Amino acid sequence: MLPPFDEFGYLPPGIHACGVQELIVRFGNGSPEREVETQELIDFFAWARNAGIQRVIVNGSYVTAKTAPNDVDIVVLPGADYPRGEPTCDQQEARWPFLQVFVAADEADLEEWSLRDFGTDRNRRAKGVVEVLL
């Protein structure tokens, strides 16, 4: 279960795991922006499962208390058999205009993205990210 937001509207620092359904229930409504981004995420998660993505970290204002988030930042870790006959993430960019997707080179790179690059806001305030369990 995802923890509550802090006084700044962020999840507590760290990587918080949840399933797709919990992510949708927690963050998927409340504004037209959230609804559109959620539909793109649902499509993205289906592609990620089919393409052999091993891990997915979701960040950005989507996983905050912000009513109308601008976009969704994502970092993925491909599995050994990626892309399993699916188009690659780069080839799908136009399919998800509200998602900004980065591809980690390995587990260490994913952790760095999650905790260092995504783990603070513009004011260097620590915040959490969500790992979606596919």
Put a short name on every predicted segment.
Residues 1-55, 59, 63-69, 78-134:
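Catalytic core of pol beta-like nucleotidyltransferases
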